[in-house]
Amino acid sequence: MNLQHRIARIALIAALFLGSMPAAAESVLLTLTGAVTDGRVELTRADFDAMDWHELATSTSVTDHQPEFRGVLMRDILAHAGAEGSQVRAAALNDYVVDIPIEDFYQFDVLAALYMDGVPLTPRDKGPVWIVYPRDDHGVLADIRYDMRWVWQLVALHVQ
């Protein structure tokens, strides 16, 4: 058997083997715990895609322009998870943790943004999920207390 036939045979065996392997599980972007359905809800990109998406252009305290964010409303995420509580403890990849009143998510159109200026957010640029308040739509949101609630690299919400 010549070298070409051996390479073709190896490629065919590899393709058959790899084709029979189960697809890798989709990565979890956000985990909700506490007062949610069954005590734990893990959201993948497919879960986010199943919800209504919204766009929001607003200034931030960490950008030099007014970015346009795209994502899902925080209140829709809470509803999807069957959350019942008065606050969430938001936790980020960088170990930042802050308590946020759930009332914020009903009083304002707060986004769980996955895109900024049309580009998917990654952990290197505040993603994969960034809590974004509609700062320019409500004067009160310019207060530093709200700036502390803009959690980037969001990975978990504990509903209490």
Regions found by a protein language model. Give the residues of each.
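Bacterial N-terminal signal peptides that target proteins for export
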Residues: N2-A11
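Bacterial N-terminal signal peptides
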Residues: I10-S20
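N-terminal intrinsically disordered, low-complexity segments enriched in P/E/S/T
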Residues: A24-Q160
